[in-house]
């Protein structure tokens, strides 16, 4: 049995007079239902609510104002789920709607609740259809088309594989629309190759928008031991071939030493509310020895936060290299820094169990 998370991008759901959006969804669902019958478990992360809402409202162009996009999503989400429910019911399966936001997943309780709910639905042989809640969050509308969300969902349920279906057949060394010599990339074997690819593409238009968020999603998932495949989903039969085990598109191979669910949540789901700046000794102890952070190694603190909130950990070069849950408030740290000479011992600021490296 394989547990899959499948992300379908907005552009793939645009139908036409001869091949409607329902036809597209129905074809995808035929392959999903086949895999379910063979014992696999599948969660679908589907964009498309805004586009369907605009179609329902007969807009000639996509609105630019965020509130109009959110209102369009409110209309389109209902229609999107109706199409999935109609398609999957014809194959004998029930669907469930799950609307999430990045900020909700940044809460450990909400993250665990979402994880447990998704797993229970899979136990019931129900197909969860996940989308970002565009009404309360505008992150997908501005940036990600659900790429990051799909990776967070995959880590939350400890999926085996994440499939990112898009409108390109591979990742390329550069933008193939501009550079005729751009080479397709078939395998990303480790985090170093992925980091190098991210760095190289940051310097070009190829590294913005959709490609950038897909690389981020791949990084989140592979760090947690999840295999990622990016493939051209414009022909739904490609999904069937992927679910049958065929290698198509670009494969991001999983880290053989995954960081674990909790550390992945710390690294990627939480939104830090402050910064703690360290001296060289504390930075090296954390990076090379996996040490906890003590007050003696803290040079300064930025931001206002209470105890048990997430923070960035900054080295002497001003670079973030870790994140963690701080056991002290910002005020307590400032007082501690100013009175260090009067204390014996050094209070714990971040325990190693809730501290994760975010750069090598």
UniProtKB/Swiss-Prot annotation:
Its biological purpose: Catalyzes the transfer of a phosphate group to glutamate to form L-glutamate 5-phosphate.
BP GO annotations: L-proline biosynthetic process
Keyword Thylakoid recorded: no
NCBIfam families: proB
Family: Belongs to the glutamate 5-kinase family.
Record has ATP-binding as a keyword: yes
Domain PUA span(s) in chain numbering: 273-344
Binding-site residues for substrate, renumbered to this chain: 47, 134, 146
Record: residues binding ATP: 7, 166-167, 208-214
Single Gene Ontology MF annotation: ATP binding
Main location: cytoplasm
Catalysed reaction equations from the record: L-glutamate + ATP = L-glutamyl 5-phosphate + ADP
HAMAP family: ProB
Name used for this protein in its record: Glutamate 5-kinase
Localisation: Cytoplasm
Entry GO CC: cytosol
Keywords: Amino-acid biosynthesis, ATP-binding, Cytoplasm, Kinase, Nucleotide-binding, Proline biosynthesis, Transferase
Pfam families: AA_kinase, PUA
Enzyme Commission (EC) number: 2.7.2.11
Pathway: Amino-acid biosynthesis; L-proline biosynthesis; L-glutamate 5-semialdehyde from L-glutamate: step 1/2
